């Protein structure tokens, strides 16, 4: 929605509206243009704009000031959508014959801004500067965040079991997760997976085994029975993913797949991502799943899950190349496939969601990913 004052020439306001709309269109957003609003006495333009917006499923309302405008005309529209995040965007003047010409956009935004704050709106303030390019990066950052927030409200995560190994950091609180972030977490029992194994189509199993053998790189020979077992688990879990529409999934790992089925689920996770395009985490890490979803919605990229193992004073130390697996033993388990794929190096963003004192917070940092020295986790066959 673009706003201007009734005494400003409508042609100039329309021109500024069209330019701003063009910038947003060029950035690739799915837009609804509610038009130009002025402070006419009977709020005809304001009410028309509000009506255009009615029923549109929006993640963000862009409130664009093309010039000074009395705040009451703006609130006439925005207060009907106070539950929607807003981007308050002040345009700017221009230079003509060596003079600055302005429609006093920031006179409008600096009055609107404290009112929005007083009314409790959730908004971001961005403004243009004469002679500078449009603040596209700031516009995109906020609108993308709003889109991610909206997507989370429809997101569902599946968890086989709960609190693997009695871990603390993987727990979640369902009401706050749904209320504050919007994510619905749906548990299901390992027994569902086990019973689904007998319902699988032999052709699908054979196709899965063929895919693994032809596309994965094996560091040493592997018994086909191990591959078939992993494919069957993935297809059985996939039935539930398809049925419930999950976008991310986490499994009962150590106390479930390893302890009860004697099968570390590394290859199962790889296949679930391949077949069903879901994000995956081990060990009932629901918070890890939600972290992945947030970062995926913000970046548009698949978000891998990694763990910390060591810190170094000077850090010398997603896959790069084919999926690489190694038949290996771990502890009491004598048959399993260990994922030993190479991880891409370069600039990375690392993130983790946490719930503390009734609020969610995200720890985010960037770094340079480098190839680590040779290493393996104690307990696995050497080398692993």
Describe these PLM feature segments:
Residues 1-113, 117-149, 154-158, 163-248:
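Metallocofactor- and cofactor-centric catalytic cores in central/energy metabolism, strongly enriched
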């Amino acid at each position: 929605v673009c706003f201007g004052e009734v005494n400003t020439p409508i042609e100039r306001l329309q021109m500024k509206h069209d330019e701003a709309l063009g910038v947003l269109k060029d950035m690739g957003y799915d837009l609804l243009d509610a038009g130009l609003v002025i402070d006419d006495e009977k709020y005809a333009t304001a009410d028309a704009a509000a009506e255009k917006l009615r029923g549109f499923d929006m993640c963000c309302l862009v409130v664009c000031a093309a010039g000074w405008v009395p705040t009451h005309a703006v609130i006439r529209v925005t207060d009907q959508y106070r539950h929607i995040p807003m981007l308050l965007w002040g345009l700017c003047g221009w230079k003509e014959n060596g003079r600055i010409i302005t429609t006093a956009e920031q006179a409008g935004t600096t009055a609107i801004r404290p009112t929005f704050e007083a009314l409790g709106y959730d908004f971001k303030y961005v403004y243009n500067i004469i002679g500078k390019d449009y603040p596209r990066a700031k516009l995109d950052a906020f609108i993308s965040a709003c889109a991610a927030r909206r997507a989370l409200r429809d997101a569902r995560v599946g968890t086989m079991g709960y609190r693997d190994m009695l871990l603390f950091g993987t727990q979640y609180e369902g009401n706050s997760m749904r209320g504050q972030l919007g994510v619905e977490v749906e548990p299901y029992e390992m027994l569902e997976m086990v019973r689904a194994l007998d319902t699988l189509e032999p052709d699908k199993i054979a196709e899965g085994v063929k895919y693994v053998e032809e596309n994965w790189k094996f560091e040493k020979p592997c018994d086909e029975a191990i591959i078939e077992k992993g494919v069957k688990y993935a297809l059985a879990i996939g039935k539930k993913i398809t049925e419930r529409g999950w976008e991310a999934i986490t499994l009962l790992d150590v106390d479930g797949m390893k302890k009860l089925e004697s099968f570390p689920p590394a290859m199962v996770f790889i296949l679930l991502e391949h077949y069903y395009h879901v994000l995956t985490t081990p060990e009932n890490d629901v918070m890890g799943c939600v972290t992945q979803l947030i970062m995926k919605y913000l970046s548009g990229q698949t978000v891998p899950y990694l763990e910390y193992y060591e810190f170094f004073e000077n850090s010398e130390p997603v896959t790069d190349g084919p999926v690489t697996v190694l038949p290996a033993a771990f502890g009491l388990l004598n048959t399993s496939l260990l994922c030993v794929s190479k991880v891409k190096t370069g600039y990375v963003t690392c993130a983790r969601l946490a719930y503390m004192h009734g609020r969610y917070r995200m720890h985010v940092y960037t770094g340079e990913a480098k190839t680590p020295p040779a290493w393996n986790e104690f307990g696995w066959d050497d080398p692993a």
